Regions:
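Bacterial N-terminal signal peptides
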Residues: 1-8
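A short, polar beta-strand/turn micro-motif
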Residues: 14-66, 90-210
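A glycine-rich, hydrophobic loop/mini-helix early in the fold
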Residues: 62-85
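Hydrophobic beta-strand positions in blades of beta-propellers and related beta-sheet-rich domains
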Residues: 72, 170, 223-225
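C-terminal outer-membrane/trafficking sorting elements
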Residues: 76-79, 207-250
């Protein structure tokens, strides 16, 4: 009888759900990895655009069950246009999310995303930041952390956006701004002298992103060629030439 009571008590303890919130300074990764304890991670989304990175993978159906009508986007490419560096995102809602990967999330309403560790496909606390460069000398890193980050000069999406319609607006952080766990931000690691702003672009497809970046690179590489006296020459001419202010030997 005493053994049955002990087993029953243990089962109740295992079935009891422990809630943790992504608004705390640091995620309890050790607790979330326990197989004998059901843990529910709660992450608040404002209406509009948010960012998200989780330590486990979820299918599209699991994401749909965790929060209503979310749109998930991933960073697919970057390209400078004029003085603005465009960050191209594509819809990947149908793919769900991968552990440690940063995403852009659109939520039509303010709501909580609630996920239990027992429902996740796998647990992986390795952060997989996305780093991209363009042909103008810009390099961007899109990443997250499992604890709060205070960093001057990091770019992020403000918690509340006083904009209609709601847009994915980026702001450069000051010393008093904090990125809480599971939020993602952009680091402008290398900045071209002519680039002054960052802008998020919601592309219709990966094919569109490829077409934009390829066309821009072709335009740059097919520019006019000059000899050392400043005279325009054929791009197939042999010898030392100048293209876009750089010496080229052919």
């Amino acid at each position: 009888m005493m053994m049955a009571t002990a087993l029953s008590t243990t089962a109740v303890a295992q079935n009891r759900v422990k809630n943790i919130y992504a608004s705390t300074p640091k995620l309890d990764m050790e607790l979330m990895q326990k197989s004998d304890q059901t843990v529910q991670l709660n992450r608040y989304f404002f209406a509009g655009y948010n960012t998200l990175c989780l330590p486990f993978s979820l299918t599209a159906d699991q994401m749909a069950a965790a929060a209503k009508d979310l749109k998930i986007e991933r960073l697919a490419g970057i390209q400078q246009e004029g003085q603005t560096l465009n960050l191209y995102f594509v819809d990947c809602t149908a793919d769900g999310i991968q552990a440690g990967v940063p995403y852009l999330i659109y939520s039509p309403t303010a709501q909580y995303l609630r996920v239990k560790n027992s429902e996740a496909l796998n647990f992986d606390n390795e952060l997989k930041a996305v780093r991209m460069s363009d042909n103008n000398g810009n390099t961007i890193t899109f990443g997250s952390a499992w604890e709060s980050i205070e960093k001057v000069g990091r770019y992020g999406i403000p918690a509340k956006q006083d904009v209609t319609p709601l847009q994915a607006i980026l702001v450069r952080t000051n010393a008093d701004k904090t990125f809480l766990p599971t939020r993602c931000g952009f680091s402008w690691d290398q900045q071209a002298p002519s680039a002054t702003d960052l802008q998020i672009i919601h592309a219709t497809s990966m094919a569109e992103v490829t077409a934009i970046t390829t066309a821009t690179q072709s335009k740059t590489s097919d520019g006019n060629y000059y000899d050392l006296q400043g005279r325009k020459v054929n791009k197939n001419a042999k010898g030392l030439r100048i293209q876009d202010g750089k010496k080229v030997v052919k």
